[in-house]
Amino acid sequence: MIDTGHAALAGVDAVGLIRRHPRRVAHVHVKDVRRAVFGACQARRASFLDGVVAGMFTAPGDGDLDFEPVVRALADTRYAGWIVVEAEQDPKLADPRTMSALGLKTLRAEAAAASLVP
């Protein structure tokens, strides 16, 4: 399983993992990262939960990650499994439906460009 947000914050190259171990990628979670929020949380030694509540994660298209290389790697390795769009943030700060729609729109555009379509 690959989770783009967790991989990015851990300093893991998700694209490299996908390309090196395509048979081990059975499920993909995509979420974006707000690096400034993450950095501020690290500076104050906040907990992971505090970081989530502060908004270090967001839907694809609303943060700092580039999803084109991820989707391209999935297409190149003929990935045919689920891609789950995650919008992990406080619903009081960002409407879940709006953020989910943004994530889906972002991933659909990248998937079409990479010819990763069902």
Q: Can you name each region flagged by the protein language model?
A:
Residues 2, 7-118:
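Histidine-acidic metal/acid-base catalytic patches
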